[in-house]
Amino acid sequence: MAQRSPQELFHEAAQQGVLARSQPWWKIQLFMWEPVLFGTWDGVFTSCMINIFGVVLFLRTGWLVGNTGVLLGLLLVSFVILVALITVLSGIGVAEHGWMGSGGVYSMISSVLGGQMGGTVGLLYVFGQCVAGAMYLTGFAESISDLLGLGNIWAVRGISVAVLLALLGINLAGVKWIIRLQLLLLSLLAVSTLDFVVGSFTHLDPEHGFIGYSPELLQSNILPEYSPGESFFTVFGVFFPAATGVMAGFNMGGDLREPADQHTPRLPSSCWVSRGFSNIIFAFLLGAVCTREALRSDFLIAEKVSLVGFLFLLGLYISSLASCMGGLYGAPRILQCIAQDKVIPALAFLGNGKGPNKTPVAAICLTSLVTMAFVLVGQVNVLAPVVTINFMLTYIAVDYSYFALSMAHCGLAQSPEPMPRQGPDALHCSEHLLQDKAPSYGSDTPAGSLSEGTLLEFTKDMDQLLQPIGGLESQPRSREVNQVLKSQKHKCKKDAKQTLQDSFLLDAESPLSFSMGASERLSVASCGEQESYQNQQTSRSESHDHLVPDLCTQPRANGEDFFLKCRLQEQQVQRRPSAFYVCMCNPWVSLLGALASLLIMFVIQWLYTLASMGVAALVYLYIGQASPGLYLGSASNFSFFQWMKSFLVPSCRSLRSTREQIILAPSPAKVDMAMTQAYPGQWQTSATRERYHRSSFLSREQLMPPY
């Protein structure tokens, strides 16, 4: 039997020989008794495509065109696609820095902005997923009730609750064949979409408002004509939940066989481009073949346009159930990851999992209860704005995460303007530690020796302990050692001495000439390190230009390179090999997308936006008090307000802040100084005393002579 590729959909079953031989029906395992991991295409691609074909596309596209018109409707659909695409590209940019965790959006934001912000946004995202699941179930129940002729609102709620309980049982049991039906479900969605396109020019139904293509009809539907109480932004708030499935692929990072696969990050963007193309086709065709009255009043007008209405309804049912199933799958696992990280101690019981895949049973039950509470609302147009605000807050956090990570990664967060240099021989900010000589109190210090208690004295002691390269006696010997160090700098690791020099910010390129061999050994031993560091800085700057070309092309002072190296080591940001789609990730575009989303939130539902932001602020403060020791994030050294101040204040001369400067006493560059005793030969015992002043306490009895 040939060896199968691990990317195949039935790879796990083929290894067990299930496909090779038939088994009796009573021996077939329907439930997952072992961990099941997804591949790149059968996991990420199919999940993204099924989740983004939601109920809003099938039930509210005609209503959107009937209110906004064809022209403004296409503009609204394009704007929704653009906002979601910017978020997808921002998520790809964060994932390319090494993130791919099991917590989905929570892990992504926590790795950049810290656990406190990640926990806050993660809880908002979980709440939005629960409300979105209720909206999908309500849309499914509306279609079933219309098909059965049931106009009662309680019929819609009863159908929604029954379907929710069925999906809850499937999610808890983990039926294996449900996972393997994803490609089949995706094929049925494609067939239903094709059925709608073919039906738009193969038949007519004037009784229900489907009169076919005509220039007069398209011209009458080109301009907006809103229903009473509707506007552009209310329609936008109802239609935006069509973009809520873009993060489904990122939420599956912990259930992939190969999370670091190079194809994984680009699949969500490919899926969303396909979804955007489908939205535009739906909006244009409905506006070109149906009357405005039918578009605004009949939510199932697309079913009348389809050639075979049953196929369209099948696609609607599949998309509704799959989207709800995706919410019941992703939200509990994010909640489980938050509980496992102990972000909120009160939710620690939700971190336990059962079964081989660590199924979060408690989290699934909790999210199902929240979903059931919103199912009782029973109206899609009421639930859609709630979903919109929560998801837009999440998308703002993702966009800002990539912007902050890019700014912190390029070292522009703390130093937007380089300090002017006084000359080509200006000292580095770490050189004064090497050149200042502390006095030795009373010790017998010969001329030309190193001063006691300095970092160079510590380095000399480490030379004696670690026994590095021996003393250099002549200039030819120094050149020979330099050549040896240059040849071996890429073959061996740093020794302990060089590691200590890095940690104490020692700089070997000092203009002072020390007479002892220890200083010569210091300069020679750190020569190889300085050259390797310069090479690393060159390669790192090239990779930075590759990563964010707009940010890294700004000039930077040479004295800042050393501290930039230290900051990058603290951030511990990983980079993968650059791919062709990385150039599409731009931090400035992400920032503009975040600001645009924030503005739209206030225009759609400003009251609910303020309430959501207030709740988020309270959760943020509570997490800070309950769990103060959370991870700060790789972009913790970036402050948005300091960054804004650095750009806005210099533009106004009257508001220009004075730069703080520290004046250091100049040290003689080419003069050797030594300390000698004022009276040689006397007080020899003072040379053996330790390097600090002593004090003692004398009582009254010791001071008064005895009588």
From Swiss-Prot:
Subcellular location: Membrane
Keyword set, alphabetical order: Chloride, Ion transport, Membrane, Potassium, Potassium transport, Symport, Transmembrane, Transmembrane helix, Transport
Region (Disordered): 469-489
Record function comment: Cation/chloride cotransporter that may play a role in the control of keratinocyte proliferation.
Family: Belongs to the SLC12A transporter family.
First-listed, main subcellular location of the protein, grouped into a coarse class: membrane
InterPro entries, per the entry: AA-permease/SLC12A_dom, SLC12A_fam
Domain of life: Eukaryota
Lineage: Eukaryota, Metazoa, Chordata, Craniata, Vertebrata
Organism: Rattus norvegicus
Membrane topology: Multi-pass membrane protein
GO cellular component, one term: membrane
A GO molecular-function annotation: potassium:chloride symporter activity
PANTHER family: SOLUTE CARRIER FAMILY 12 MEMBER 8 (PTHR11827:SF6), SOLUTE CARRIER FAMILY 12, CATION COTRANSPORTERS (PTHR11827)
Biological-process GO terms, alphabetical: cell volume homeostasis; chloride ion homeostasis; chloride transmembrane transport; potassium ion homeostasis; potassium ion import across plasma membrane
Protein name per the record: Solute carrier family 12 member 8
